[in-house]
Each structure stands twice: as structure tokens, then as C-alpha cells.
Amino acid sequence: MDLRTHLLAGHVIPAQPLALDRNRKFSEKHQRALTRYYVAAGSGGLAVGVHSTQFEIREPQHNLFRPVLELAAQTVRAELAAAPRDFALIAGICGQTKQAVAEAELALSFGYQAGLVSMAAFKTEPEDVIVAHVATIAKLIPVVGFYLQPAVGGRVFSYAFWRKFAEIPGVVAIKM
């Protein structure tokens, strides 16, 4: 599958929510059901480990980032085995560069085709530092930029920033 062509075709790629049981614990059974639903509904892909799945899944006390990414990838592969079609698996990628590189490598190991890169970890850093960060990630995995609005914890970026961002080889889209 050519990812850029797939994205330009205008597919719906929902952000997967995190399924919890009545005790607020991760429910693998319900998480699989959500993934199967999105595939059966005809979505063009799935964004996993992003805002709807909760950033907190990365925290050591939860330690759910790896299992959530792996489960979604396994379930998508199993569902598409019977009726193959193009489907974009996009992993959320967060944190400063060291963490983001590790998350990108993990996503690639599970067969994800792109990373939705959050820049929320860069609260005050110069824009050129953030561009360099994204360029580092884009060398590993195709990047979907993620703009977090200031009203929900993001920051304003200049036109020059977005211009440089869009020129990074490996950036395939920007979610706004």
C-alpha cells in the first residue's frame, strides 16, 4: 500500500478509544471488539495510542502502550486476512526525541505504517528544535503531524514552522 495515496483518497481513520471494564481496568476483549468494529465498518485505518486512547497508557503504573499497540495490530491483521484491503495503522508517538524514537521503533515492529507525532512535550523549546525532532522521527516512520490547540494544552506555531514541518521528507499529513 502506498500510504500517501491511501491518505489522499480521503479515508476515515478514527482514533481508537481505550476500552476499560467496570473496574476501570484495560479490557482486551472489548478492545478487540472495538478494533473489529472499525475494520468491519469500512474505515481506512486506525490511529492507536493517540488522544482517544489516552496518553496515560504510557505511564509506568499503567504500562499499556505496548499491549494496546500490539493488540490492535494483531486484530487488524486477523480481520483483514479474510478480506484483504488497504488499511493504515497509525501509532501515536509522544514525548521528547528519545521516547518518541522508542515509540516509533515499537510501532514499526508491530507493522504500523505511520506515526501521529504529538509535539505537546515541547512547551517552550524553539521551533527549530521541534522541526529537528520531527525530522528524526520521520527518518524512522512516516509522520502525521498532530497540532494540539492551545485551548487544550498545545501552543501556537508560526507559519515558518509549518512550512519547515511540511518540507520534512517523510511527513505525509498533518492532523489539525
Predicted regions, residues:
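Active-site beta->alpha loop and helix N-cap motifs at the rims of alpha/beta catalytic domains
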Residues: 1-159
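Short, surface-exposed loop/turn motifs that are enriched in glycine and acidic residues
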Residues: 151, 175-176
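Active-site/ligand-binding-proximal alpha/beta "capping" segment
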Residues: 163-175
